[in-house]
Amino acid sequence: MIPEIIRNTIFIGCGSFIGGAARYLISVAMKAMSKGFPWGTLVVNLVGCLVIGLLWGFFSKNSSESSSWALFMTVGICGGFTTFSTFSKEALIMLQAGNFMSLLAYVAISVIAGIALVAAGYYLVRI
């Protein structure tokens, strides 16, 4: 029998692979339309916020579901899909370039819409 911590680590790693690969593919696909604004990162982070809200609502409502499955989906896939470090790097690049309006819009949309989408996802499932 595999210890739970090893099993969960494997589940998270597999989910991270899926989420990271999906993030890369979306970023590549959106690069052509970016024109200097990090649309790919914004889209994956906002989609990830909605998805983690939906999953949080689902797993809190259905506590009988496996914690390994919840870790695979939330920490693994959503964690691999979304990226705070790239968001921060892109924000710093805008700051260094003096693109203050783009920086303000990027940070405000990311944070405000991100929180709103997590809440929307959570409450949609909890209804």
Where are these predicted regions, by residue range?
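Membrane-interface helix-loop junctions in multi-pass transporters/channels
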Residues: 1-127
